[in-house]
Amino acid sequence: MSRPSTPLLDKAPTPDRLRALPEQDLPQLAEELRTELIDAVSTTGGHLGAGLGVVELTVALHHVFNTPYDRIIWDVGHQAYPHKILTGRRDRIRTLRQAGGLSGFTKRAESEYDPFGAAHSSTSISAGLGMAVASELSGEKRNVIAVIGDGSMSAGMAYEAMNNAGALDARLIVILNDNDMSIAPPTGAMSAYLARLVSGRTYRSVREAAKQVAQKLPKFLQDKARKSEEYARAFFTGGTLFEELGFYYVGPIDGHNLDHLLPVLKNVRDTQKGPVLIHVVTQKGKGYAPAEAAADKYHGVNKFDVITGKQAKPPANAPSYTKIFGTSLIEEARHDDKIVAVTAAMPTGTGLDLFGEAFPKRVFDVGIAEQHAVTFAAGLASEGYKPFCAIYSTFLQRGYDQVVHDVSIQNLPVRFPIDRAGLVGADGPTHAGSFDTGFLAALPGFVVMAASDEAELRHMVRTAAEYDEGPISFRYPRGDGVGVDLPERGSVLEIGKGRIVREGTKVALLSFGTRLQECLAAAEELGATGLSTTVADARFAKPLDHDLIRRLAREHEVLVMVEEGAVGGFGSHVLQFLATDGLLDRGLKVRALTLPDIYQDHGKPDAMYAEAGLDRTGIVRTVFAALHRDELGHEALPTPFRA
């Protein structure tokens, strides 16, 4: 299929070339950019809706500001694909999220036009403020623009940064991309006119003069003047909250109308002193009918047919882990009315949308606010409820102090279902669930579990529901289960007890999580070479099954721990126990297989696990090396001594 015709876009591969175009050409450029974006993402998959919503804004920003000298920071980065196309990366845009290709987010190592990497939300204003202050300290007149969505404004970090920026009176521009109309819709031409007016030099000069006059009035008249001025501006523009934080507010304006965007951005560029917030209203999926009609379904997409919008989804051999969690929690909630669920703006991603349909009054979406989510759940637990605080592994990092201070130290029975554990593939290192086992298992009294398959996940949901002795977590990966038979309802597992799933005599493989299937496959290969292999499912990283580990250590020559997490997790805890229990004193050969001590770039999970040595081939190779055997499993001959 031929690519769309884009004559203007072909002339503007970089922002300096874009700035050379006359303004009357920019609407056509925006349409060509939108067409190119749709075509590219249809071949790669990725985040489509957000990018379609900021096409005109992206064109306007690069036309008005002198990038890369001026800094544009895209919060989260979902909306940065048009930015990538306009900043010299169009020739690689069809490698998005592919191994060796462009990142799906902004990345400093990828381009000088990406001044700050992102993927987690609500960081742009803080980073932008740091850059703005650095510019002032260096005596430079650099513009710093942070583009943040209204969803990201639900996180406290955004307001912490705005409060600091207002206090510093820093030269910072924040563009609030309101694509859900959750703050205020535009009011047509009058709103655009007022936004243009109040961003201009004349209005601001008059306003400053009026303030100076008011300061000479008696205090009670000063207060009345201030309140009257705030009321008038709030009536027209709705910006009182941002004004109170020290920002000059402009908007709301139509983020798809270049005739409105360009003059406002120029006025702010030319007159700005302290921090300014420009409120633009956009539509997610703008310009592509299927995405406009179903914004949630086109936020993140698989490859799709541009004509029909139909996404290519491979048939599932088993239900997803996320769905198993959601349906299992519903089953437990039917038996226990104290069970409630908490999510931080990810009800669909965590499976709690299903729970919400069944129990709408027992699910709480707190927004992009993981810190609050954890402590909110702690409050529920303190009053006798059973909160399941479902957060992706990578996002739980944002609430770690609350996990320690508000949950663990008080030994409150908050349940943590940890989705997206292990590698997640195309989203890369910012979304990998690598660290939760290590940072949770370090906490005294914290129960840490990992499901090896979907049936085990169902058992762990039941176990967590019944466990009231303190905090408990269970991790599971993105994607479909392995196809095992599912019980109608899970069973309660004995805390701190694993299981043997295959008996052997020479080699022991101790798996924590869904690498169990690779361990079983490796055991078959090892058995074919005469190495009888035991395979065990640890289930628990904390408390460890000491009896099981002792048995494996005493009855086998080689013990290999396998986990889909970083160094410092399950394997480290097992090694600590082996050492303190004296089990290393008899010549046991021990190996710990973990994710490598690097941030792995995006790619396909299977290939990434193979690269890490966490597939069957890597496990077999590790056993052979421990026993000094070659790649075929034959005992290696000693190297002849040479003088």
Swiss-Prot record:
Among Pfam families, the record links this protein to: DXP_synthase_N, Transket_pyr, Transketolase_C
- Cofactor binding: number and manner: Binds 1 Mg(2+) ion per subunit. Binds 1 thiamine pyrophosphate per subunit.
Q: Which biological process terms from the Gene Ontology are attached to this UniProt entry?
A: 1-deoxy-D-xylulose 5-phosphate biosynthetic process; glyceraldehyde-3-phosphate metabolic process; terpenoid biosynthetic process; thiamine biosynthetic process
GO molecular function ontology, one term from the record: thiamine pyrophosphate binding
User: What does the record give as cofactor?
Assistant: Mg(2+); thiamine diphosphate
According to its UniProt record, this protein's enzyme class is: transferase
Q: Which reaction does it catalyse?
A: D-glyceraldehyde 3-phosphate + pyruvate + H(+) = 1-deoxy-D-xylulose 5-phosphate + CO2
Q: Where does thiamine diphosphate bind?
A: H78, A119, H120, S121, G151, S152, N179, Y288, E370
Q: What InterPro entries does the record tag this protein with?
A: Dxylulose-5-P_synthase, THDP-binding, Transketo_C/PFOR_II, Transketolase-like_Pyr-bd, Transketolase_BS, Transketolase_C, Transketolase_CS
Report the EC number(s), separated by commas if there are several.
2.2.1.7
The pathway that the record names for this protein is: Metabolic intermediate biosynthesis; 1-deoxy-D-xylulose 5-phosphate biosynthesis; 1-deoxy-D-xylulose 5-phosphate from D-glyceraldehyde 3-phosphate and pyruvate: step 1/1
This chain's function reads:
Catalyzes the acyloin condensation reaction between C atoms 2 and 3 of pyruvate and glyceraldehyde 3-phosphate to yield 1-deoxy-D-xylulose-5-phosphate (DXP).
HAMAP family membership:
DXP_synth
Its family? Belongs to the transketolase family. DXPS subfamily.
Subunit (UniProt): Homodimer.
What name goes with this protein? 1-deoxy-D-xylulose-5-phosphate synthase
Organism the protein comes from: Brucella suis (strain ATCC 23445 / NCTC 10510)
Which classification does the entry list for the species? Bacteria, Pseudomonadati, Pseudomonadota, Alphaproteobacteria, Hyphomicrobiales
